[in-house]
Curated annotation (Swiss-Prot):
Keywords: Flavoprotein, FMN, NAD, Oxidoreductase. This is FMN reductase (NADH) RutF. Catalyzes the reduction of FMN to FMNH2 which is used to reduce pyrimidine by RutA via the Rut pathway. The keyword Oxidoreductase applies. NCBIfam families: RutF (TIGR03615). One of its GO terms (biological process) is uracil catabolic process. It comes from Enterobacter cloacae subsp. cloacae (strain ATCC 13047 / DSM 30054 / NBRC 13535 / NCTC 10005 / WDCM 00083 / NCDC 279-56).
Length: 164
């Protein structure tokens, strides 16, 4: 059996839908943010999630030094904000495009996020090109947006809440 090549892996991963998130930080190393879909729950006791971050990303040193982050899960209609944080736009312009509050850790929390998870990075594991950031959740804020946003098949898709 042969190991799948990089393109085959990427094409298969495009079939795996995931929530769209903006990951933010602020602290001694400065303020930064990026768009990520590589985010998932680890355990609820204690509440912990993980975020994958490429060590070659321009924001990596900032997150690495600050050791705090906020996972802001986007709702439908926030695609332009996702694109802004996913590109090469200067940080100041990224943050100017939305309304933010400050979370308990000092990280920016998106006011209109579907959910915001304010976290402290408790452990970092390096695998290949990425660091897996294990994050202890300090606080959670939810917003009653009617639709979620997922990335699937290399595009955005809205998810409706089920009717009760």
């Amino acid at each position: 059996m042969t190991t799948p090549d990089k393109q085959t892996f990427r094409d298969a991963m495009a079939c795996v839908g995931a929530a769209v998130n903006i990951i933010t930080t602020d602290g001694p190393a400065g303020r930064a943010g990026f768009t990520a879909s590589a985010v998932c729950s680890v355990t609820d006791s204690p509440p912990t999630l993980l975020v994958c971050l490429n060590r070659g990303a321009s924001v990596w040193p900032t997150f690495s030094e600050n050791r705090t982050l906020c996972v802001n899960t986007l709702s439908a209609g926030q695609e332009p904000l996702s694109n802004l944080f996913g590109g090469k736009t200067p940080m100041e312009d990224r943050f100017a495009a939305a309304r933010w509050q400050t979370g308990e850790t000092g990280c920016p929390r998106l006011e209109e996020a579907l959910a915001s998870f304010d976290c402290r990075i408790s452990q970092v594991v390096s695998v290949g090109t990425h660091d897996i950031l294990f994050c202890d959740i300090v606080s959670i804020i939810r917003h009653p947006a009617p639709q979620g946003l997922v990335w699937f098949d290399r595009g955005y898709h809205a998810l409706m809440r089920p009717a009760c």
